[in-house]
Amino acid sequence: MAEKKPAKPTQKSQKSASRAKIAAMPEPDRAMATRLHALIMASAPALSPRTWYGMPAYARDGEVVCFFQSAQKFKTRYATLGFSDKANLDEGDLWPTAFALKELTAAEEARIGALVKKAAS
């Protein structure tokens, strides 16, 4: 008898898993991830929340476009907002794919919003 493959996670279950990962983070990563989630969803509502390597991520058509890495989980001095190769951020032959995050001010939020909108286009 053939083994059944596990069912693919639904968009709803992936969204719940992403929210659970954020809720389980210690501060200040939780506050930053919560704010980033709201910012990403406002800037690119077509992206779907999910997890990727155990961290919150945002996908277009099932492919991760951007993701958050907790400073505490990775034992770094800053959190990271990263973009995958599916992000539409290409600028010539060289462009950044990750950004260090120590604090989210209005200026950073505006820059992140513009980057996410472009990445998801």
Summary of predicted features, one role per range:
Residues M1-S121:
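Charge-dense, helix-prone N-terminal extensions
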